[in-house]
Amino acid sequence: MTLLWCVVSLYFYGILQSDASERCDDWGLDTMRQIQVFEDEPARIKCPLFEHFLKFNYSTAHSAGLTLIWYWTRQDRDLEEPINFRLPENRISKEKDVLWFRPTLLNDTGNYTCMLRNTTYCSKVAFPLEVVQKDSCFNSPMKLPVHKLYIEYGIQRITCPNVDGYFPSSVKPTITWYMGCYKIQNFNNVIPEGMNLSFLIALISNNGNYTCVVTYPENGRTFHLTRTLTVKVVGSPKNAVPPVIHSPNDHVVYEKEPGEELLIPCTVYFSFLMDSRNEVWWTIDGKKPDDITIDVTINESISHSRTEDETRTQILSIKKVTSEDLKRSYVCHARSAKGEVAKAAKVKQKVPAPRYTVELACGFGATVLLVVILIVVYHVYWLEMVLFYRAHFGTDETILDGKEYDIYVSYARNAEEEEFVLLTLRGVLENEFGYKLCIFDRDSLPGGIVTDETLSFIQKSRRLLVVLSPNYVLQGTQALLELKAGLENMASRGNINVILVQYKAVKETKVKELKRAKTVLTVIKWKGEKSKYPQGRFWKQLQVAMPVKKSPRRSSSDEQGLSYSSLKNV
């Protein structure tokens, strides 16, 4: 029987198609009316012809002898098929201009067509139906309607949508409300009231998806309708203000030189207003940018706050501004349902700063030259500068330090080194500079113990002056004893400094104390005839290493002449 019905339906459908295909008004596929329903739930779909395309209703069409025919195209197929209205329990049925599914299945997804026709008239339209699945939290790919509530505006309600016509008014359904996954029960400011959900005070925390599940009986069966909508809390009209222009303002002046790029932002704040059209635009000399000849580009960006307050920014750009452009009037305008405002930007031509190129170059060159001269002077005369400072501002190190000698001289005991020490060093340091030297062979008493007296002399001296020569590094000499004692005293107590004077070059030595001393201490080199003059670099280096002492130097020309002549004869 079912097979016979299918064959007959296809036969008559083919006849209808062939007769009416050439003269039927086909409105095509109305994608704007895509219908989405949940699987295993009932759905009722009205033919869109009577709602959007035709000027008469179904009753008028039926009275005029027109017949409404339904057929469909399965998903991913091209073949149009008649709808089977003989399924068990009348799962799919038609009632006047409504197509019923009790309930829908996933394979019901496709494009459905309703055709109104008779022998002289034909009109049809198709629309897509999508059956979707939902999870336990009512999540699905379905597009959700958005309902906006005013923040802190008093009691507001939302209503469970799209449930009219599914059951008669005599049936009392059961309605359960959810926020996300959670059943709404004992919420602070949200109260279910049947088909309505009341918000006592809408807050930002109330943003989210709300679902109503409507359960009703029909012919001994129980059906469920699931409807989800998104609640968005927006700014209250009580707090709405006219547009506020943040930029341009009186505090910012756009100064540009001809040829530079001119960028002027117009930033406007709009309070949220339901169905308000927010507009921002520029005028240049009272005209819109499109009505003038200059090359102007305007870029716009829009951002929203959590309560849907809007900030619009339009940036006016002129790539290469001219002197004439900098004299024009640039005004930003804004309009909303609350009013219209305008603000002019302050634009002017930048006055070029005077250029002191030559003066700056000369000043910079003079500064560099002065710095170079100072560096050279310091490098050449740093010894003189140190000695000058010590002579006038230095603190006398010899006061109350308990020392008897300024310098203990350590040297190799042979004729050449002794002559250098006794005549040259002693002559200048004692006679010219006024230092008190301790020379063991001169100042020690006969019969004493050499080791004890050596250590005693070193402890009584402020400096240990070591005269280095090849003979100095011979093992077992008194000179090495003096060196070791001085270095140990300097390292452990710090009350004596060691001065190294190289009288003659010393090759590699196995004396580790001397190796260590030459690594950490500066060596003052004696250069023979070049170093004999008391005002020469050798003696100045030696003076810097000596203790600061406020003792008058011998200044008579006779004594200086004698000393210098004696040095020349050494």
From Swiss-Prot:
Topological domain ranges for the Extracellular compartment: 21-367
Enzyme superclass (EC): hydrolase
Glycosylation positions in this chain: 57, 107, 111, 118, 196, 209, 299
UniProt modified residues of type Phosphoserine: 557
Cytoplasmic side: 389-570
GO biological process: cytokine-mediated signaling pathway; immune response; inflammatory response; innate immune response; interleukin-1-mediated signaling pathway; interleukin-33-mediated signaling pathway; positive regulation of interleukin-13 production; positive regulation of interleukin-4 production
Polar residues bias (residue ranges): 558-570
Catalytic activity: NAD(+) + H2O = ADP-D-ribose + nicotinamide + H(+)
Record field: transmembrane: 368-388
Ig-like C2-type domain sequence ranges: 21-128, 141-230, 242-348
Residue ranges of domain TIR in the record: 403-546
GO MF terms, alphabetically ordered: coreceptor activity; interleukin-1 receptor activity; interleukin-33 receptor activity; NAD+ nucleosidase activity, cyclic ADP-ribose generating
Region (Disordered) location: 549-570
GO CC annotations, alphabetized: cell surface; extracellular region; glutamatergic synapse; membrane; plasma membrane
Swiss-Prot/TrEMBL keywords: Cell membrane, Disulfide bond, Glycoprotein, Hydrolase, Immunity, Immunoglobulin domain, Inflammatory response, Innate immunity, Membrane, NAD, Phosphoprotein, Receptor, Repeat, Secreted, Signal, Transmembrane, Transmembrane helix
Pfam family, one: Ig_6
Active site: 482
Tissue: Detected in liver, skin, placenta, thymus and lung. Isoform 4 is predominantly expressed in brain. Overexpressed on candidate chronic myeloid leukemia (CML) stem cells, hematopoietic stem cells and mononuclear cells of patients with acute myeloid leukemia (AML). Overexpressed in patients with chronic obstructive pulmonary disease (COPD). Expressed in T-helper 1 (Th1) and T-helper 2 (Th2) cell subsets.
Disulfides per UniProt: 24-122, 47-114, 137-181, 160-212, 266-332
EC number per UniProt: 3.2.2.6
Binding partners and assembly: The interleukin-36 receptor complex is a heterodimer of IL1RL2 and IL1RAP; the association is inhibited by IL36RN. The interleukin-1 receptor complex is a heterodimer of IL1R1 and IL1RAP. Associates with IL1R2 to form a non-signaling interleukin-1 receptor complex. Isoform 4 interacts with IL1R1 in an interleukin-1-dependent manner. Interacts with IL-33-bound IL1RL1 to form the minimal interleukin-33 signaling complex with a 1:1:1 stoichiometry. Interacts with KIT (independently of stimulation with KITLG/SCF).
Family the UniProt entry places it in: Belongs to the interleukin-1 receptor family.
Role, per record: Coreceptor for IL1RL2 in the IL-36 signaling system. Coreceptor with IL1R1 in the IL-1 signaling system. Associates with IL1R1 bound to IL1B to form the high affinity interleukin-1 receptor complex which mediates interleukin-1-dependent activation of NF-kappa-B and other pathways. Signaling involves the recruitment of adapter molecules such as TOLLIP, MYD88, and IRAK1 or IRAK2 via the respective TIR domains of the receptor/coreceptor subunits. Recruits TOLLIP to the signaling complex.
Domain notes: The TIR domain mediates NAD(+) hydrolase (NADase) activity. Self-association of TIR domains is required for NADase activity.
Protein name in the entry: Interleukin-1 receptor accessory protein
Organism from which the protein derives: Homo sapiens (Human)
Gene that encodes the chain: IL1RAP
